[in-house]
């Protein structure tokens, strides 16, 4: 399993727009074979950092998701919203291997 850690730098004055974007994007991972662990929005600390975490069985499955989502109408609408509102200033994508307490 791989987990994608997607760190956004957002416009804090467009937080509501970013929340709308997130609500549109969140269900898509599950529709294409992954698990979305949620959107994590600013609360304490920097007011311009948000994170999405989602997992796929493999990097190959994630790449299939990336290909499929490019044609998804909900994803296209979310990206348009982000572009029009400029709620996302930049983002960084990292891939991690989860480790759980009950695993050797």
Q: In which residue ranges do the predicted regions lie?
A:
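Short acidic/glycine-enriched loop/turn segments that link adjacent beta-strands
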Residues: 45-48
């Amino acid at each position: 399993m791989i987990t994608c850690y997607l760190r956004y730098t957002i416009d804090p004055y467009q937080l509501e727009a970013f929340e709308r974007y997130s609500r549109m994007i969140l269900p898509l991972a599950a529709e294409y074979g992954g698990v979305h662990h949620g959107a994590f929005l600013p609360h304490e600390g920097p007011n311009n950092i948000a994170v999405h975490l989602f997992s796929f069985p493999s990097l190959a499955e994630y790449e299939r998701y990336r290909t499929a989502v490019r044609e998804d109408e909900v994803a296209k609408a979310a990206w348009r919203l982000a572009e029009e509102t400029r709620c996302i200033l930049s983002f960084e994508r990292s891939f991690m291997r989860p480790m759980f307490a009950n695993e050797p």
